[in-house]
Curated annotation (Swiss-Prot):
ATP binds at residues 7-17. Disulfide bonds: none annotated. InterPro entries: QueC, Rossmann-like_a/b/a_fold. This is 7-cyano-7-deazaguanine synthase. GO terms for molecular function: ATP binding; ligase activity, forming carbon-nitrogen bonds; zinc ion binding. Binds 1 zinc ion per subunit. GO terms for biological process: queuosine biosynthetic process. It comes from Trichodesmium erythraeum (strain IMS101). Pfam families: QueC. It comes from the Bacteria.
Length: 222
């Protein structure tokens, strides 16, 4: 069984790649250089892909800085920092990149059709904070319908399935799953700031660090 895995190099997507491997899939990884502030994550994506031994790893390049609209694609917009979970959950954060998962899933779908994969794995998660609209179960269900209606495979046979194993999991549960699968956390990257070391105060760092602390574990990146 072949599967395409959306791989950013972060904690969630790395766990999903390891889960796909554990599910017995032949893994094809796809990552994206969209000129994000935290381009450093692609180094981690390459390392994680190598540890699993994926069949192929494609890095697709396009520039979302041309219209900005997010703190991750516009350096003039400050990253939110040092917020607690309650603050993060109040509004869609400025780190939301408009339609990003729709763009990513479209590329993954095309790639899956080409390599004749039956699954696309994505590491979206809806529980830790209600920030991103394209990380919710109803969004994944809607995109599954796109996969069914918009592809040759969907019209002539069985549609490529979107697999989102982390969608209803807390960050602590994701770390526990990753530990059981042997994910090398030291090779992953979560920080939005884009430096050589994690900033420790952006939303992504805070969520990650808090989860490790709740489990009584040390984050090897901090």
């Amino acid at each position: 069984m072949k599967a395409v895995i959306l791989l950013s190099g972060g904690l969630d997507s790395s766990t999903v790649l390891y889960q796909a491997k554990a599910d017995g899939c032949e893994c094809y990884a796809i990552s994206f250089d969209y000129q994000q502030r935290h381009l450093r994550e692609l180094d981690s994506a390459k390392k994680i892909a190598d540890t699993v031994g994926v069949i192929e790893h494609h890095i697709v390049s396009f520039d979302l800085r041309s219209w900005g609209g997010s703190a991750l694609t516009d350096s003039q917009i400050d990253l939110p920092s040092d917020r607690d979970l309650e603050e993060m959950s109040q509004n869609i954060p400025i780190t939301y990149v408009p339609a990003r998962n729709t763009i990513f899933l479209s590329f993954a779908l095309a790639y899956a059709e080409v390599v004749n994969a039956s699954r696309v794995y994505i590491g979206v998660n809806a529980l830790d904070y209600s920030g991103y609209p394209d990380c919710r179960p109803d969004y994944i269900l809607a995109m599954q319908e796109v996969f069914r209606l918009g592809t040759r495979q969907g019209r002539e046979g069985e549609a490529i399935a979107i697999v989102a194993p982390l969608i209803e999991m807390k960050k602590t549960e994701i770390i526990q799953l990753g530990n059981s699968l042997g994910v090398p956390w030291e090779k992953t990257w979560s920080c939005y700031a884009g430096g050589e070391k994690p900033c420790g105060i952006c939303d992504s760092c805070k969520l990650r660090l808090t989860a490790f602390q709740e489990l009584g574990l040390t984050d090897p990146l901090m």
